[in-house]
Amino acid sequence: MARHGCKADSDHLPVTLEGKLRSGVYTLPGNVSSQFITGLLFALPLLEGESEIRLTTKIESKGYIDMTLKTLKTFGITVTETESGWSIPGGQKYHGPRMRYAEGDWSNAAFWLVAGAIGGSIGCQGLDMESPQGDRAIAALLEEFGAETKVALNQITATHKEMKGIRIDASQIPDLVPILCVAAAAAEGKTEIYNAGRLRMKESDRLAVMAECMQKIGVEVEEKPDSIIITGGCNPPEGEIVIDSHNDHRIVMAMAIAAVSLGVELTILGAEAVNKSYPSFFIELAKLGGVTNVL
């Protein structure tokens, strides 16, 4: 940002920005956070000159970038893909329809689908089966585990069947990893989730936190720099089990599903973190029979 006209004081909160963003060539890695890329894709068309985004590494979480490009096109913005990134003409304006359908969130639906796959049958409505959302992969992954999934119109239902461990490449689906760890705990044998090192830079170090959570509920787990290996089977210890969510909404939701699906009573610290992405999560959980108490 400093090379393109913006000065940021980010040593402490609040973050202070000054200056005006200038068009030009923006070079950044593609394997740190897709949000850096999508933010630029939204902003650069509004600048005066032409800009280019050049990536120095392979893209991860490409689905989120595809969603951004689809939205930009809908609102009249031109972006051209290049060999190393994208070219963005300047001086553009956003023009869109008065009404816009917002498709359902596959990332949040994944928690319920895993719950259904572990112990019952749960359907989620309002999902686009052709969505560019990378987390749509949850349906195929549950099938690979051995669970049953059925699609009818805009609804998908996951139903319990005996599950077996699998290998999962997490490079394009990092947000699914916490709930996939729960699915792995309910599957027979080992599940390896690899290409997951980027999870260490999320709201928490999700690899380390999920390894800790799995251990606390009696699941055998091995944490590596870029992967996590889980052996199915849950043997919770006696006494109170307290989970520190590290204020990470996906950790809270994953462990809440683990509690009700695997039959483990937990105390989850920082459960209010769900307000970031799914404020009604615990209301929906109660509708499905989950018992929760706010401390």
Where are these regions (language model features)?
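Short, structured segments at the rim of ligand-binding sites
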Residues: 1-295
